[in-house]
């Protein structure tokens, strides 16, 4: 009777798709070369025949060690997956050449005997796949290469079976043997009945009164060539394999390759195949079958060339076509969003910026002081870079003029006096991306030249501001007034944080990073927002007309400045010195000015100190400014006084801006300037008198 085989069907765990997604995105990138993947199969005693013979691909299949064999009772299969870059490449891959190459690996291992070290190659497989990382659709096609026997093997006698006692003894003996051999040998082995001896030691679970009249002996495939069967009668010799098939008469696919080995290595044209279908928990069921096989006589048993190879899997409709898994149908939407947020960023590492450190950016905790126009755009750009922790501080409410310029707010947010900006901005970010860790605090920042009306409340606001600055990595100054930025500038410098600042004019903007505390004892560092001031910041809203009180700018200025500010932050984070990175120094002059990357392999380019933009002529200038020894916010005397006095210093400074001017040295600078101006005026007066006398003499 002709022999028929039950083909393998693929069965992929959902976590495997996620692992393949991550592997492609984070490691393989454009590399589409084949990589190992572990397959597993097992006898399923309770499964319908159609549900048996499954090649299982677990979630850990890509990372499993070569010595692993998966859960207890499962047999390993050696596989490779080729995950190509485009669907066109998938379609154009030569499928015949691919399966032929897989068959050659099996054939060569049989020919040179290396199959004995890795019998699991007889159950090998290949996967051709394409992962659409944007749509979470995986197109894949399994191949289970099988070498065809010619002439075919046929069953010569009825199928044999073991009784319950024989099966139990066999299962026990195989279990003992497996502890002594490599896991790759577990699926294929030799078995013989040794008669004339006691059945040998039994498990405590066996019935001690049962004697089957022989004992089982198990050997590896290689043992055939060293005389394993020499002392056994022909009817007591079995070549065995783990058979996941539940069909009463049809063995599973791996037997095809095993029969080639039997012919090519053992030179046999007649053999008893033990299809091992029993498991330890159900060893009394005796499900294994014995196939007496023979093939027609041939002149030479040894094959001279590799036989025909087949084995591409049919899809659910029975067609020779690939399968498609739409992972989006099974994934939690929040998890989908998580992976989608990182997708474009990780694609940067494929070609354009392979050294980009995305984790550093992602894990940077950002504090945004101001949730208005700048705060809205900055937060959206931070989300685009994958930042997961964002905190807003703002004391204002959403007004009807805000939604058209501030993209985090809607018309409904303006009703009933307006929702608190910081709270609503946080809620809006959460709606955009649920995975962001965002908070909002309706908090007033203490400001210079603004009197303290409630000291307890102002101190509580100061304490909360200090707590938030200390717990974040990057501080963004995005408020409307100059004086509101003074205290956060001072606190950020004292805490050695990354401080980012953006300010707008009608058609101009400045984007800058504040200088950090020097790494050495020098005082040479980059300046802050206040280092160009010759007076201490005061109440800028007092006695101002409406157009001076509102931020009147061209609508695109805020978006441009915000984008540059976030890009500057990411460049800082990619520099090995972070906030201590030096500013680039220009080479050349005029239109020929240029800058060099420092370091030269910085993935994003320059890390400037300031970028000043002019929308009237669409130009940017890169500026490098040193810290000012008499700066009202970052000079050493002011920093030392703040570190020593804390709230007491801040309370004094808020009560009298002259105190800050005297402490920093700005007051003395002004006195010297006034004195110099007076002396210059006196000198000009003297020069004028001399000229008049001369003119008189000429006349």
UniProtKB/Swiss-Prot annotation:
| Gene Ontology MF annotations | Atg12 activating enzyme activity; Atg8 activating enzyme activity
Q: What this chain does, per the record?
A: E1-like activating enzyme involved in the 2 ubiquitin-like systems required for cytoplasm to vacuole transport (Cvt) and autophagy. Activates ATG12 for its conjugation with ATG5 and ATG8 for its conjugation with phosphatidylethanolamine. Both systems are needed for the ATG8 association to Cvt vesicles and autophagosomes membranes. Autophagy is essential for maintenance of amino acid levels and protein synthesis under nitrogen starvation.
Q: What name does the UniProt record give this protein?
A: Ubiquitin-like modifier-activating enzyme ATG7
What family does this chain come from, according to its entry? Belongs to the ATG7 family.
Regarding domains, what does the record say?
A: The C-terminal residues 653 to 691 are required for homodimerization, as well as the interactions with ATG3, ATG8 and ATG12; and the C-terminal 17 residues are required for the ATG8 lipidation. The GxGxxG motif is important for the function, possibly through binding with ATP.
Q: Where is the active site?
A: 550
Q: Where is this region: Homodimerization?
A: 653-691
| Phenotype upon gene inactivation | Leads to lethality. Heterokaryotic delta-ATG7/ATG7 strains and RNAi mutants produce aberrant fruiting-bodies.
Compartment(s): Cytoplasm; Preautophagosomal structure
Q: Which UniProt keywords apply?
A: Autophagy, Cytoplasm, Protein transport, Transport
Q: In its UniProt record, which GO terms are filed under biological process?
A: autophagosome assembly; autophagy of mitochondrion; cellular response to nitrogen starvation; piecemeal microautophagy of the nucleus; protein modification by small protein conjugation; protein transport
CC per GO annotation: phagophore assembly site
Q: What InterPro entries does the record point to?
A: Atg7 (IPR006285), Atg7_N (IPR032197), Atg7_N_1 (IPR042522), Atg7_N_2 (IPR042523), ThiF/MoeB/HesA (IPR045886), ThiF_NAD_FAD-bd (IPR000594), Ubiquitin-activating_enz (IPR035985)
State the oligomer form and interacting partners: Homodimer. Interacts with ATG8 through a thioester bond between Cys-550 and the C-terminal Gly of ATG8 and with ATG12 through a thioester bond between Cys-550 and the C-terminal Gly of ATG12. Also interacts with ATG3.
Q: Where in this protein would one find the motif GXGXXG motif, according to its record?
A: 370-375
State what induces this protein.
Answer: Up-regulated under amino acid starvation conditions and at late stages during sexual development.
